[in-house]
Amino acid sequence: MKGVENTLSQSESVNRGYNGWMGMESETSARATHSSEQMISLEEYVREMLPMHLQKLLMERIIEAEQTGAAHTSVFAAPTGVAAQYPAMGPPMLPGQTFSSRSFAEGLVVGQLSVIVVLIFFIKFFIFSDGPAKTGGGGGSSAESRSSGFTGSPLTSTTSRLLSTLIKRGGKEGTEFAEDSENERTRQINAILEKTYYDVETHSPESLDWFNVLIAQTIQKFREEALQKDNIVHSLNDFISRKSSQLPNYLDAVKITELDIGDDFPIFSNCRIKYSPPLNKKRLEAKIDIDLSDRLTLGIETRLLMNYPKYLTASLPVKLTVSMLRFQACLTVSLTTAEEFVPTMAATTDTDAGDSEGHYLVFSFSPDYRMEFDIKSLIGARSKLENIPKISSLVEYQIKKWFMDRCVEPRFQFVKLPSMWPRSKNTREEKSDMQEEDPSRAPE
């Protein structure tokens, strides 16, 4: 009730002020009709009379508020009258009204931070996570890999499943091909032969003339570099110096006296694709006939040291020249992975274990190969013994034994294939005519 009375008193005071102003205005207009000298302009009224009326109205408002004791209630009451016309003169904003905007800003910041943390966690542990530990040759390392598999395998398997769903082959999901792992390799071989229109049983052998041209160009480049920079001579001398500690004590230092790298090229022919017999049609291999008729010569000299009855009692000079004249064989080439073959050495180094990943080009020669030599020997200083048959047969046997232990079936050599994905560091550009004339000029 007090609030209503205060509101009524406010409206009455405003009305009184308005009536007083209207009365003064009518009185002023009356005076203006009687005498133009006593006329008060609007500017003078706003400057002199209006402040007095407003001050009087304000004093009455303060006195009434003190009398009723409801000054606090009247200030925060609902806006009516003048307060309704001027909202800026209403009650001040309470601290509780700013709480909603502040809490919204804090919630927005916390939400953004939580999303960033989740993204960082996902990228670190699902995208850039390390693979499972490599399994060593011993039983202890395999046990460790099995024990560590409980922590690493779920994460890597989840990542692999996530990425495998993105890869498709021929419009089909990649997981469809990985489910049947037993027949997967056979299915791939059959698909390759079918889509390339190649029948292993009836397809005629190929001549490989284009391949002979490429191989001839490569060998020619090697020969030019060997003649210009003596790379082969330096390599052989370095090899002999490294192996000098393994020579028996009755041999002196070995020196190279002659080197002939030939001028002919190997001829590859009669290429045919066959199934690899040990794997039951799970791998393809290419069989190529190779024929080389050239003269590749290496001449060395050394001394036989006579250390009995005293050290360096006498020495016997020895000169040996070995020339390969003919080589014929059937070359077998295939692609494989490291899991499909067993190393011949029992112990492997860390670098060999790191190279066991990826794909390899495997090649070997058939046991019925043909290798012809021309071996010349000269022993002695004054009374010389020349071309002893026993020495020739011994040298030829050692060369063939070295070759069979490394390149003849069932032994083979493998070469790791590089990554075939295009990379910026492997990108080159052909030189223009201006750059060939001036090699120092770089392209703009």
From Swiss-Prot:
One Pfam family this sequence matches: MMM1
Membrane topology: Single-pass type I membrane protein
GO BP annotations, alphabetical order: aminophospholipid transport; mitochondrial genome maintenance; mitochondrial outer membrane translocase complex assembly; mitochondrion-endoplasmic reticulum membrane tethering; protein insertion into mitochondrial outer membrane
Compositional bias annotation for Polar residues: 1-16
Compartments reported by the entry: Endoplasmic reticulum membrane
One annotated GO molecular function: lipid transfer activity
Compositionally biased spans, kind Low complexity: 142-157
Keywords linked to the UniProt accession: Endoplasmic reticulum, Lipid transport, Lipid-binding, Membrane, Transmembrane, Transmembrane helix, Transport
Domain of life (superkingdom): Eukaryota
Residue ranges, compositional bias (Basic and acidic residues): 426-444
Lumenal topological intervals: 1-107
Location of region: Disordered: 1-20, 136-157, 425-444
Entry GO CC: endoplasmic reticulum; endoplasmic reticulum membrane; ERMES complex
Residue intervals annotated with topology Cytoplasmic: 129-444
HAMAP family in UniProt: Mmm1
Family, as annotated: Belongs to the MMM1 family.
Function summary: Component of the ERMES/MDM complex, which serves as a molecular tether to connect the endoplasmic reticulum (ER) and mitochondria. Components of this complex are involved in the control of mitochondrial shape and protein biogenesis, and function in nonvesicular lipid trafficking between the ER and mitochondria. The MDM12-MMM1 subcomplex functions in the major beta-barrel assembly pathway that is responsible for biogenesis of all outer membrane beta-barrel proteins, and acts in a late step after the SAM complex.
Name the record gives this protein: Maintenance of mitochondrial morphology protein 1
Species in which this protein is naturally found: Eremothecium gossypii (strain ATCC 10895 / CBS 109.51 / FGSC 9923 / NRRL Y-1056)
Gene giving rise to this polypeptide: MMM1
